[in-house]
Amino acid sequence: MIKAIVLDIEGTTCPVTFVSQTLFPFARRQLSKTICSENRPSNVTAAIEEAIAEWKNDPESKSQALLLRASNQNQPTSEDIIHYFDHLIQNDRKSTALKELQGIIWEQGYAAGELQSPLYGDVVPALNAWTQQGITLAVYSSGSVKAQQLLYAHTTDGDITNRFSQWFDTRTGPKLNADSYRIISQSIGLKPASILFVSDHPRECDAAAEAGMETRFCLREGNPFSDGGDHQMIHNLGEIKL
């Protein structure tokens, strides 16, 4: 019996185009100004320090080449860090520090009314129905928890953060690693077999299934993956029968 549902965001509850064509470009436009600000807040400084630590431990050859060219390898300048972030963005590299910084920038954009998150029309009705059934709802996304909560706090359907009781990001572990889903099940306090994971990424579904979770592969118009493999396919959350 399913007692909890863990939802991906991009391509599952929110169109992939919002993330790729709105959120990421917005963060990139604000990145230099945010990093180079003389009066940057402490959370930005913390994200930058985390990025430097990640950079020094990044084994990728281009990352190390950039570090060697930095004016001070022990304490890269703001300009050096921007070059590193540009490299991560251009190559779609996953970075917890970059995600944190993007989340800070998006928070400013949401607060200013420059950003609003579109949801698929079936999402809120499904969340409401599951909540009424006593199902625990959680989020697992590669975006930071801050970014997740901002997205759901500023949707076209209003603030729906109260529908979710737990939030997970890459600090829990990689989404393609089965151990990450085992950690999530432990955090929720349920056996994996009692948890349903929904995502538009077949390999994420593979990892969740390996951990023992039930899975649904979500195929939406415009999603990058169309083959869900052995996972049961849905086209909207209303198709999920518990």
Swiss-Prot record:
Q: Which pathway does this polypeptide act in?
A: Amino-acid biosynthesis; L-methionine biosynthesis via salvage pathway; L-methionine from S-methyl-5-thio-alpha-D-ribose 1-phosphate: step 3/6; Amino-acid biosynthesis; L-methionine biosynthesis via salvage pathway; L-methionine from S-methyl-5-thio-alpha-D-ribose 1-phosphate: step 4/6
What keywords tag this UniProt record?
Answer: Amino-acid biosynthesis, Hydrolase, Magnesium, Metal-binding, Methionine biosynthesis
Q: Name one GO biological process term.
A: L-methionine salvage from methylthioadenosine
Q: Which reaction does it catalyse?
A: 5-methylsulfanyl-2,3-dioxopentyl phosphate + H2O = 1,2-dihydroxy-5-(methylsulfanyl)pent-1-en-3-one + phosphate
Q: What is its EC number?
A: 3.1.3.77
What GO molecular function annotations does the UniProt record carry, in alphabetical order? 2,3-diketo-5-methylthiopentyl-1-phosphate enolase activity; 2-hydroxy-3-keto-5-methylthiopentenyl-1-phosphate phosphatase activity; acireductone synthase activity; magnesium ion binding
Q: Which cofactor does it need?
A: Mg(2+)
Function description: Bifunctional enzyme that catalyzes the enolization of 2,3-diketo-5-methylthiopentyl-1-phosphate (DK-MTP-1-P) into the intermediate 2-hydroxy-3-keto-5-methylthiopentenyl-1-phosphate (HK-MTPenyl-1-P), which is then dephosphorylated to form the acireductone 1,2-dihydroxy-3-keto-5-methylthiopentene (DHK-MTPene).
Q: Relate the assembly described in the record.
A: Monomer.
* PANTHER family per record: ENOLASE-PHOSPHATASE E1
What HAMAP family would the database entry show?
Answer: Salvage_MtnC (MF_01681)
The Swiss-Prot or TrEMBL record describes its family as follows: Belongs to the HAD-like hydrolase superfamily. MasA/MtnC family.
Name of the molecule in the record: Enolase-phosphatase E1
Q: Which organism is it from?
A: Synechococcus sp. (strain WH7803)
Organism phylogeny: Bacteria, Bacillati, Cyanobacteriota, Cyanophyceae, Synechococcales
**Gene assigned in the entry:** mtnC
